[in-house]
């Protein structure tokens, strides 16, 4: 079981995108995870500009902003209950032994 999934709300903790004055502004939803490169793409963060050529698939060329990638080690999952960035733990629950993710700060289930 993975500790970070697509659709999770995360906060950037370190790197160029981290904000020391107001860390809550650097939050977003995970769009894509590249496990081999250990990078994550987050909605609205680390926007990079790409110069696109006009093609039949994209008739409008020009400069387009796309989300870039952030190192997986620089982000943490935000708990929905305590609204803080947290480490994620995994435990088995119920008779079937299903694995569930939980917040290590407040012990609430993440999914």
From Swiss-Prot:
Gene Ontology MF terms: rRNA binding; structural constituent of ribosome
SUPFAM superfamilies membership: Translation proteins SH3-like domain (SSF50104)
Superkingdom: Bacteria
InterPro entries according to UniProt: Rib_uL2_dom2 (IPR014722), Ribosomal_uL24 (IPR003256), Ribosomal_uL24_KOW (IPR041988), Translation_prot_SH3-like_sf (IPR008991)
GO biological process, one term: translation
Keyword GTP-binding: no
GO cellular component: ribonucleoprotein complex; ribosome
Record key words, sorted: Ribonucleoprotein, Ribosomal protein, RNA-binding, rRNA-binding
Function: One of two assembly initiator proteins, it binds directly to the 5'-end of the 23S rRNA, where it nucleates assembly of the 50S subunit. One of the proteins that surrounds the polypeptide exit tunnel on the outside of the subunit.
Family matches, as NCBIfam families: rplX_bact
Protein family per UniProt: Belongs to the universal ribosomal protein uL24 family.
UniProt-listed HAMAP family: Ribosomal_uL24_B
Subunit description: Part of the 50S ribosomal subunit.
Name of the protein in its database record: Large ribosomal subunit protein uL24
Organism: Myxococcus xanthus (strain DK1622)
């Amino acid at each position: 079981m993975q500790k970070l999934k697509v659709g999770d709300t995360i906060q950037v903790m370190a790197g160029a995108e981290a904000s020391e004055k107001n860390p809550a502004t650097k939050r977003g939803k995970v769009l894509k995870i590249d496990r081999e490169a250990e990078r994550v793409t987050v909605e609205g963060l680390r926007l990079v500009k790409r110069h696109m050529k006009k093609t039949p698939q994209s008739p409008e060329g020009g400069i387009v902003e796309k989300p870039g990638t952030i190192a997986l080690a620089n982000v943490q999952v935000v708990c929905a209950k305590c609204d803080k960035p947290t480490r994620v733990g995994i435990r088995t629950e119920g008779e079937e032994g299903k694995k569930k993710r939980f917040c290590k700060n407040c012990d609430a289930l993440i999914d």
